[in-house]
Amino acid sequence: MVAIGPAYAQEPSVPTPVPIAVADSSDNLAPTASVPWNPPRAVHTHEPWEQAINAPLTLVSLPIKALGALSEAGLLRVQEEHQIPRLQYSLAVTARSGIIVGVGGIEDGSGLGGAVRFTPPRTHGWVRGSLAGTLRHYHRGIAEVGPRWLVASYVHDWRPEESFYGIGPDAAESDASDFALQAERIGLRLALSRGKRWPRELEAWVGERRSVLRPGKASDRPSVEDVFPSTSATLDVPQIYRMAGVRVALDTRTGRPHWSRGWRLEAQAEDFGTVNGDGLVFDGENDSPGFRRYSLAGQVGWSFMRDPRTLRLIARVVDIQPRDASRPPLLNDLSRLGGGAGLGAFEPGRFHDLDLLLVKFAYIFPLVEYGELEISTDIGAVSGDVWNTTRIDQLERTYSVILRPRSHRAPLGSIGVSWGREGARVRMSLGGVE
Amino acid sequence: MRMRLPGVTLVCLLLVATVTRTGGATEAVEPAEPAGPRTTEISYYYDFVRHCAARPIARQLDLGREVRRLSGNPRQAANVDANDQVQLPSTWWTPRLGFRPVTVDQMLRGPGPGTGPAPGKLIIERAKSQGVTPGFFVKDSAGTAFLLKFDPTALAEMATGADAVAACLYWAAGYNVADNAVYTFTAEDLELSSKATVVDKKGKKRPMDRDDLMLMLEHVPRGPDGRYRSLASRLLPGRPLGPFEYTGRRGDDPEDLIPHQHRRELRGLWAIAAWTNHIDVRGPNSLDMWTTENGRSFVRHYLIDFGSCLGSAATSKREALAGTEYFLDYQVIARQIGTIGLRPFAWEHAVDPDLPSIGFIDSDTFNPGNWRPEYPNPAFDERTERDIRWGARIVAAFTDDHIRAAVARGQYSDPRAADYLTRVLIERRDKIVRRWLSDPAVTADRP
């Protein structure tokens, strides 16, 4: 036993419970050059009996060890050849030339993909372009001109496998189908933000859109016209909309690595005006079913402790009002739930209807320095009229547990599982996490 | 039958390979004249992945370890005598504080002489290309070679101070370290060797010119007198063989017969690392040197690079949680999930001293029973209480005067910084002593 008195801090109170055999008996404090003590033979990492009981697992692990050895050699080469700095340099050079390469999909359900953004040098950022694509053959191209607060843009979208199960909250899972959407959009957008204590955002836009519904391209489900024959008349018909919209928001959210305090209120109104035949920019056929879309969204967060444990309440309501009640919007313009849009346990596009109501309650807490966990529940439903026909017994619920890798500044992505009435679904994203 | 033969042969070969790889019972070591072992290198990336992810899983699947755990019979260090002390001589560690009287002056002299480069011009041989901080390899007017390392721009004195202080403490604790000293110079003191090289941003090695030098110095903090501050680390004698691992043995060193994770000096290092918050204690921050002394050539094992020690994280200050969890800490994750995050982390009560030259280190939230490096260290994973008490005995032997003198090696311009670091080290030492040496229940003879 070692007895340490309170004086140890003042004197060299070396506890000397046992004499120590100092082979190099000189008073020299320098390291010895003598032959070091060693046992007569090499000591095993494991005792023989440990090796014996571990033998089966050792055998099984041999391929993994081989893989590890290969990885080690490869990673050592990366280090010795300075390949990481070289890659960083290459990315920095391409960034200086205005090209930024990124990884990520085009919204939920479009599959893993990548994007290239291009801002030509010497344009002061007034000219921007991007191309994105995914392994499921989704594509999106964007060209923008103008300062950030006033942007003229052209967008081309190809979404070949959009899920559709029918209209309404009772749409059957067995009616799975898909459609493709080809859309082009040109417009002018004004975006202003002001205020520090009460940050305010205002956006207004006008433009024209041409959209064409096509038969779905998914190989694992029938196309929409096979399951819902009434939709066949809307396929392959280019339709033009004149669009105008306004969005205002108040945003007091703050916090790192995720926003943990404050609230955000957002209201948006859009008008999709009917165009009969050709538009100002795009060619179309027939007259499009015009409609107005109103949405209201609110978020509020409250956190406690230093590494924030955060409670969040998020609500969103969307109300679509067709100009002609007998001509509802096309499938791609309906409100929808499932996947990243809400009710994550359901496939993206699982529910379609005019309106939707979604409420999400989430709790986010830290796991380790570079990871946090979100447990949440979504409650919501689509309906024909969110104010009058939404019934509590029609609300769907899903529950989620999401791991969110994070830096000290922000969440970096998410991976997790959501489950609900129709089973569980693994969800993953790179970026795009608040 | 013929079809099965290759399979049987393969299994036999695998069995042989397994036994050979793990050091079979019949393995004997041929006595041999020590030849210069080959130079090795550790991949930082592989080391990180291996010890963060792969090895913790393998440890959980280690049935032998589990049997030992359940039976309360952990494997003790393999190089201790009947009195539970390190068998000497050792090329890893020398008994100093805790085992022999070491005066403050002896500690300050350390591996010696502790004065940095000789006055006069410094000739730059090449720029440092590894690690996270910039630096130069130089020779002083006496022809002695040094590595000069610098502080991050916004945190003057932090990394250099930590390196100087910690090297002093680790030497006094018995470990082999380089002779480190804070050293200041002007740009005019530096000259480029005609053979000086630098690895540029493209990752290519090329001749170094004055522009490269001035570009690197642009980011080096200067003192009020305009001089650049550096940590001058005297290059170690001998031929560098690369870092050692905290696990396994160096196969081509006939004097390395004990798996490193079963060495008392490396297991017990945990206590000193905990005291000094050296969360960066890992293979890549070590160095084996092929040394010839007294007509004998052998491998000597050094701890190097203390720039990520105490409150410094080399390029930034330490996070408050440093030392409380691994980068990927399954135990902490499990606890957090089990309590849905409602149990506060100890570090959440930490108060930042707001001393840029110190970074962040505190004693209030320091838990001497559960300190952890940045990612698992194999030797620390195998430590038993006997190993920790061995290390704690060394920590206990540092007097306040030793600590104050070691901190003075950091040459902090702000006296509050030196006072703070001294106080924190004293309080952390006291906590270690109380936890590991004062409690009779702990010091009872149990693993």
Indicate residue ranges for each PLM-predicted region.
Chain A
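Outer-membrane beta-barrel "beta-signal"
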Residues: V246, V401-L412, E422-E434
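Boundary at the C-terminal end of the N-terminal hydrophobic targeting segment
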Residues: A7-E11
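Bacterial N-terminal signal peptides
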Residues: M1-G5
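Outer-membrane beta-barrel proteins
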Residues: A132-Y138, D175-L181, T274-G290
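Outer-membrane beta-barrel initiation region
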Residues: P12-Y154, W158-S163, E201-E203, T234-S260, ...
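Surface-exposed coil loops of outer-membrane beta-barrel proteins
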Residues: S153-G187, W198-E203, R209-R242, D333-L354
